Amino acid sequence: MDFKGDFAMRGGRCFPLTVSDNYSRKLLCCHGLANTAYAGVWPQFERLFAENGMPWSILSDNGTPFATRSLGGLSRLSKQFIDLGIRVERTNPGHPEQNGRHERMHRSLKAWLAGVDSVREELSTLRMRLDAFMKEYNEERMHEGLGGAVPSALYRPSPRAYTGRIVPYEYDSQAIIRSVRQSGEIKWRGRMVHASALLAGERIALLPYGDGVWEVRYRFHPLGFLNDRTGRIEPLTQWREIARPETPRCKQRV
């Protein structure tokens, strides 16, 4: 998932939200939004999950609204994914090639829009153009990497039905559980330690890592390491590589 940049339109700017299936390359969403705020983005994912089921993981870059610089890279959107049992993965900064298939689709979209004078068009008209691109890309354009097939012929929805219900998470029996206060802090060893205000009211787990260091997780998502000596949670620098939910492996990723 990503935004294909943004461009001027009549009365504002258009931000095309794109979501594709990693296996079949089917473009599941190519929808123009007026901004990148959670309020407009989440309904698109809710629609996608209702129509196609939920994936096991989602890959994005580190931009808004997919990630932030807070602990674990959590944003309101990525927390929503984690609450639904979806693993969030991110490319390393400055390495769009790590999501190469999606980036190649973006180049095709850019070429498709090259002759459009977007400044003269309303958002509704631009959305129709994006819908037309998605239809051609999925159903008419043969892909060499797919052996000449079209993405729609290979795509299969996820068997994970979306209900909108957040299932309580059971932590490992060895984990020490702490509740995050409204300030974003937890109480640990007699002192307050800042975690994340985004997790206020949630339970996080601390797992022994060794020599006074504890791995901190929200559900299956790693947040960082708490050091008893410093009393601080240090964020992970390569956290996406160890973020593995306790779910079966599956091809389904968007």
What feature does the model see in each segment?
Residues 134-254:
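C-terminal, beta-rich DNA-binding module of retroviral/retroelements integrases
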Residues 3-18, 22-131, 136, 230:
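RNase H-like DDE/DDD metal-dependent nuclease/strand-transfer catalytic core used by mobile genetic elements
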